[in-house]
Amino acid sequence: MKPAWMPPNKMNMLYRTVIFSTWLFFKIFYRHRVYGLEHYYTGGALLAANHASYYDPPILAISWPEEGHFLAREGLFKNRWFGAFIRAVNSHPVSGDASDISVFKTICKLLSEGKKVFIFPEGKRCHKDELDKLKPGIGMLIARTKTAIVPVYIHGTFDIWNRRRKFPKLWGKTACVFGTPILWKDFAHLDKKQAQEQITLKLERSINELRHWYEKGAKGPIP
């Protein structure tokens, strides 16, 4: 048994093993579903999702059919063995007091190499089960790299493991919905500031539309 979407040769062996084990966990306990893989984007891109839970990063990773990259607190790399492990599954250290510029440069480098970077543009886990205001930096990243954003809606994690819960429920239902990529070329005619603002607004609308699509029964074309 394996995810139907898992390709034969787009993941290194360790990453693939971790992804499969995690997918199995979410499939058994949370009946995890994936929608919108017809919106798969070739080349460097940000995959930008709502953020309600510690479960969101693994759900995003198991739902996308190729390797993705995360930014992680530098302190997590201090242990030799754990640090080696999370590096092997594509986590990149960022200092707790790192400037936005250092984070920006790390993401730009990954995108320029044609990689997918998983991010949560709210900047933190939400307090309520709704999308918080997005940080403006995501528009700047796309304007700088001329790449794309794939909007993502993650369902179910707020109820299972939100900020008020010390431990997750071992039941529930999760889903991950990928939307139509947001392309730089559609904003290239605007001046830089306008483009950044419009990209951020478009992403916010897209994530909310994906949620609406899912909650209305997950039927019809995915926006």
Regions found by a protein language model. Give the residues of each.
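Hydrophobic residues at beta-strand termini and immediately following loops
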Residues: 34, 71, 92-94, 152, ...
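A transmembrane-helix-recognition feature enriched in membrane-embedded lipid enzymes
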Residues: 2-36, 59, 80-89
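Short amphipathic alpha-helix with an adjacent loop that forms part of the alpha/beta core around
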Residues: 36-40, 108-109
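Non-catalytic C-terminal accessory region of glycerolipid acyltransferases
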Residues: 1-10, 14, 102-223
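Short, basic, glycine/proline-bearing loop/turn elements
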Residues: 21-22, 88-94, 121-125
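Catalytic core of membrane glycerolipid acyltransferases/transacylases, capturing the structured
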Residues: 39-98
